[in-house]
Structures are given as C-alpha cells and as structure tokens.
Amino acid sequence: MHVLNILWVVFGIGLMLVLNLKFKINSMVALLVAALSVGMLAGMDLMSLLHTMKAGFGNTLGELAIIVVFGAVIGKLMVDSGAAHQIAHTLLARLGLRYVQLSVIIIGLIFGLAMFYEVAFIMLAPLVIVIAAEAKIPFLKLAIPAVAAATTAHSLFPPQPGPVALVNAYGADMGMVYIYGVLVTIPSVICAGLILPKFLGNLERPTPSFLKADQPVDMNNLPSFGVSILVPLIPAIIMISTTIANIWLVKDTPAWEVVNFIGSSPIAMFIAMVVAFVLFGTARGHDMQWVMNAFESAVKSIAMVILIIGAGGVLKQTIIDTGIGDTIGMLMSHGNISPYIMAWLITVLIRLATGQGVVSAMTAAGIISAAILDPATGQLVGVNPALLVLATAAGSNTLTHINDASFWLFKGYFDLSVKDTLKTWGLLELVNSVVGLIIVLIISMVA
C-alpha cells in the first residue's frame, strides 16, 4: 500500500500542474485540491486529513510568514527611499557589470551561510532587481547566480541546521566539511549561476509591481551607500554575532536566552525593519505616514505569495504523512552502488517527493549509516565522512517543485509563472546538485 502512495503523489502533483497551467486555476486553490486528492487516495481518514492540512499550513507559515512580510517591507522601503538605487548605482560605477555578478554571488554566499535561506532570499531579491534595472539587464541574470550561491552555502555549510545534523549523524570532521565544501561550492555556483543562464534563452521579465516606487524617488535625498547596504546586512550581522557568542555562552543561561532571542530570524528581521523605518524614512525627512504607507503596500502585495506558500505546505505535509519518504528509503536501500551516489539519490528522491530538505537528508543519513556502519567500532566503513556529508547535502539542494516553500517564494517574489519557475529555480537547483555530486566523486577518487 505504501508503494502505491508514490503513484498518488505523482497524480497529485500532475493534477496541480494541469489545474494551474491548463485551466489557469489560482496556485493556492490548485495546491489545496491536489493535497485533498493525495490524502483521500492514500486512504487517510477525513479528520486526519484535516489535521494534516492545518498542521501543514500553520507549520509552514509559523515563522516564514513573519520573515517574508518584514523582508518585503524592508525591500519596499529600500526602493521608495532610493537606497536600492544608491546600492545599484554605486556597485555598477565602481565595479562594472562583470564584477557586479561576482559581488552578488559573494553576498549570496554570505547571506546563505549566515541566515536561514528564506531570510537570505528576501534580503537578496530587491537588491538584485534594482541592480539589474540600473544595469539595464534582465533581473534574472543576477537573481540566478545570487540564489545559486545562497542555496549552496545554506545546504553545504554549518552552522545551518541541515549540515550540522549531517556532521553529527556521520561523525564527520567539521573542518574538513568546510575545506571540501569550498571545493564543491565554487564549480557548483559557477555552473548553476553563471553558465546555466546562458542556455535559458530570454530571461526578460517585468519588475515585480511591489518593488516599484509608488512615487518618483528624490535623487537629491538618497541615503548614503553605507547606510543603504547596512540595513539589509543587519540580519546577517546579528545572526553571525549570535553564532559566535554561542561558542562561549552556556546554554539556557539568561545571557544565552537573550542573545538567542535577539539572534532568531523573526527578531533579527524585526530589528532590521525598525532600523529601516528610521534610516530610510524619518531620518530622510519622511513622516511616519509615508513609512506606514510603504509598510501597508508591501504587506498587501506579498499576501498572496504567503497564502500560496502555506498551501504548498499543506501539500507537502499531506505527502509526508503518507509515509512516502520511508517507502523510497526502503526501496533504495537494496541497491549496490557507491555510498556517495546512494546518499545523494535517496536524498534527491525524498526531497522531490516531500519538499523537505533536512528531512530528506536525515532520512538518507539513517539509511546509509545503517548500511556501512561497523558495529564494533561505530565508524563508517569505506567512505570519507566529510564527503558523505557533502554528497547528502548536495542531494538536499536539488530540483524542487510545487511542494516546496522555496519554489513558491521564488515564483511569487519574482512574479513568474509555474513554468518559468521550473525553468529557472528548478534547473539552477538541479545543476547545483548534480555538479556538487560530481565534485564529491572526483575528490573521493583523489583524496
């Protein structure tokens, strides 16, 4: 019966795509119809299905909704105050277009390493859109390399939760994960961020409406470059500082609680938003009504994106509750292939099925560890644990689709169709993942 659930999941995903692409049904409605179909076909009783839907919607949006809203407000204030224009103009004037691409990759790597991915994306998106507008190039030509860098850093490197969990599961040396991770990251980002866009054809898309200034920007009253770049960096500064402070702080002490409260994603974003109220608003001579108008405009514009992300969470949770992850793991564990490829493949399949990066990685880690662990020594046999971490992490950073919140975040923020999102977000993640595995295999042969 569990094997049959794979068929129901495929049917549900196909149904959503048909409703959205052929019949032009709103993505939120199509996702909910797909979730209901999968749950009922998989034999879930109606009350369990109702609980799953509420859990999927609530758990997905619990923290993410706050992050998305605060990030959208910061982005709107950056545009309306001219801060985004100041950043774009300064970078292009000093670096030129060639090095601007490199700069957004570096910023993406830093944000992806320091923040949860959703926070990193929300901070990156308005920057790359305005820089691209200033350079008169399609914004996706900068968005793709920036996002490729952020997702790679987020997936491969501690202190992000997925890599940390894998390091613990495999007993890997964290220093070697960083060293090998750099070797994996560079070609992955080059291929997904710089080479892939050359093969994607026309990337020209209109600027998302909520990132257009409601009124002409006063070019004589722009924030300085330093102030303009400081605000989007505030969450990264706070979170990096928290990570460093935790090296010395004792867990559950008052000092630890205060630092980790401030360093949590919602609070760090809230602090950045309040600073934006001042530095992009009142400090530039705008009254509080001007600031609140920007706030309300951003919230209204991002509302549908949030609802669609929540509906995607419903489908994801419904799929997870069918037990499909365990089914895929059981089927794959009977193969006789390289542990690196096996770890990557199991993670990819479960990620595709469930939309859960950390869950897919940890499921693969459990299966692989059981297969190659020496019970006498407690050590993995015949593999490099650090490379196994990276192979599994690369599998979690792969092609995703309608059951993944990040898919809908990319689609909604950049105002793309489902088809265009699969072509851009989907392919950049797939290239990232495949190149990552290839580099891991090459290192395993020479290290």
Swiss-Prot record:
Organism: Escherichia coli (strain K12)
Disulfide bonds: none
Main location: membrane
Residues in compartment: Cytoplasmic: 50-54, 125-126, 197-224, 282-294, 351, 396-426
Annotated GO CC locations: membrane; plasma membrane
Molecular function terms, GO-annotated: carbohydrate:proton symporter activity; gluconate transmembrane transporter activity
Bilayer topology term: Multi-pass membrane protein
InterPro entries: Glcn_transporter
Keywords from the named record: Cell inner membrane, Cell membrane, Gluconate utilization, Membrane, Sugar transport, Transmembrane, Transmembrane helix, Transport
Swiss-Prot/TrEMBL GO biological process terms: D-gluconate metabolic process; gluconate transmembrane transport
Pathway: Carbohydrate acid metabolism; D-gluconate degradation
Protein name according to UniProt: High-affinity gluconate transporter
Family according to the record: Belongs to the GntP permease family.
Subcellular localization: Cell inner membrane
Transmembrane portions of the chain: 1-21, 29-49, 55-75, 104-124, 127-147, 176-196, 225-245, 261-281, 295-315, 330-350, 352-372, 375-395, 427-447
Periplasmic domain ranges by topology: 22-28, 76-103, 148-175, 246-260, 316-329, 373-374
Function statement: High-affinity gluconate transporter with fairly broad specificity, including low affinity for glucuronate, several disaccharides, and some hexoses, but not glucose.
